[in-house]
Amino acid sequence: MAYVPAPGYQPTYNPTLPYKRPIPGGLSVGMSFYIQGTAKENMRRFHVNFAVGQDDGADVAFHFNPRFDGWDKVVFNTKQSGRWGKEEEKSMPFQKGKHFELVFMVMPEHYKVVVNGSPFYEYGHRLPVQMVTHLQVDGDLELQSINFFGVQPAETKYPAMTGPPVFNPCLPYVGALQGGFTVRRTIIIKGYVLPTAKTFAINFRVGSSEDIALHINPRIGDCLVRNSYMNGSWGTEERMVAYNPFGPGQFFDLSIRCGMDRFKVFANGIHLFNFSHRFQALRKINTLEINGDLTLSYVHI
């Protein structure tokens, strides 16, 4: 079963370098960009460019450039009319050989940069964001995923993702699904299974009741349980999966889509399982709960 991302959400898994991709519809305030990668052991530099065009010599509205080669700092700058402006800099938040999560949020007055869940820098706009057409990434790093949020959706039968994602939410996480589930609605959950993890749970609850329409329960090193809790009783467990992405110390990108007669769940762009609806009043399924032995990178509901 092929994975079709929800409109407004554009993931790329294990992209190769150099990474150069157009931003559908161009850049605008409210967009977010999530980059998951690993700094190489011999890292000297890497960069992320919000570029005005696809060519290597194009102007750059925002140049984000970590440098380990004797500087151990991050340089921020803008290239306008072929000339670099005045550099801004801050001390290095990355470590050689270590995994990182990097988020860029396009705000009205600046780019907000978040590194590993902590606010890192705000870079004021020197060029109008509407001029930016491409995202470029290259250097001494390995990429696991790059995700665009809030991009201009292409024509599709799926409803667009509404509202911005919540980055690095605390646990237990409780989120309201405004309007409940509807057919083709998609929920995105990206997280990290702790190295010592035993279990965690993702629950879609029904109103203020105790009912759970869909219970997803990875039991690390054992199985992946799916079930429902209705009228005070658990239903029949389902455990069969082609593969289990929830290993200790593993990142995951989970997409949960509501179909006419079932939930369709994908992990890292690969179909994981289906779960037939046991609770039919989909709009009453209006709360998402997540808790257990994991950390959350973002939730988009």
From Swiss-Prot:
Record's keyword annotation contains Repeat: yes
Keyword Metal-binding: no
Biological processes, Gene Ontology terms: antibacterial peptide biosynthetic process; defense response to bacterium
PROSITE patterns xref list: GALECTIN
SMART domains given in the database record: Gal-bind_lectin (SM00908), GLECT (SM00276)
Alphabetized UniProt keyword annotations: Lectin, Repeat
Residue stretches making up the Galectin domain: 19-149, 173-301
Highest taxon above the source species: Eukaryota
Molecular function, one GO term: carbohydrate binding
Coiled coil: none
Domains: entry comment: Contains two homologous but distinct carbohydrate-binding domains.
Entry protein name: Galectin-6
